[in-house]
Amino acid sequence: ALVSASGHHGSAGWGALADTALGIPDHHYREGSASLTLGSGFFRPDSRPSRDCSVLLARHQQRTVEGQLRWLDLMAGCGIRSLRWGLEAVQAKPERVELWVNDGDPDRLPCLENNLSDLPSPVRISSQAAEVLLAQAYLEGRFFDLIDLDAFGAPGALIQPVLQALRFDGMLLLASTDGRSPTGHDRAGAVRSLGAAARVHPASWELALRHQLGLLARQAWMLGRGLQPLLCFSEGRTFRVVVRMRRQLQPGEEHHLGLIARCEAC
């Protein structure tokens, strides 16, 4: 059920994990129902709460939406999120959920193929630049019901192509690790990446999330689409929002976008 970017079916299986030579660390890791090899790339165990939320939202969609589903892990790393989707979110009829797993680093492909080889759902693995994959999917008329974009830094440049590739009523899970700009510590950076300026504030984390929602909303409205916030949270290092894209704006939706002021005297 696994096809890599080269078109070859994966066959390594879990047995490959047992072939690691003694004395060579294989970075083996367990989380939820997943057991996998992390490889040599960047990985944050502390981000588990966001992966838990991703699994819960995917599972809810699989239970409540009829027909075929297509989920995209756009910057997959070692594939732990996709693996947990396949093991924990897909409860019945795994053939109705197609997993697209992408990482821009081609050196990640062997790790991804090995980690995802035993999933019962059809899996498509690639190592393309995110914007290239999204553009190709849009041109081919392939739309996704769920997209998880766990970006490094500010993801603003990818929001428009992500929304264009998202199916109506589909969910976008968006993460940003740019904590300076939206919390008022880099005003010029905030104007560049968010189209708004932020100030240092006692509620900086909340304002950062609101900036991110505002950016998403403006990009969706440019397409004539509506946006429904579902979930927002931050631990101060990463800012995560989950939204559902609607076919059209709801009455009064644009009135939710505004400015926040704070009196420094009192």
Report each predicted region and the residues it spans:
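SAM-dependent transferase fold signal centered on methyltransferase-like domains
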Residues: 1-266
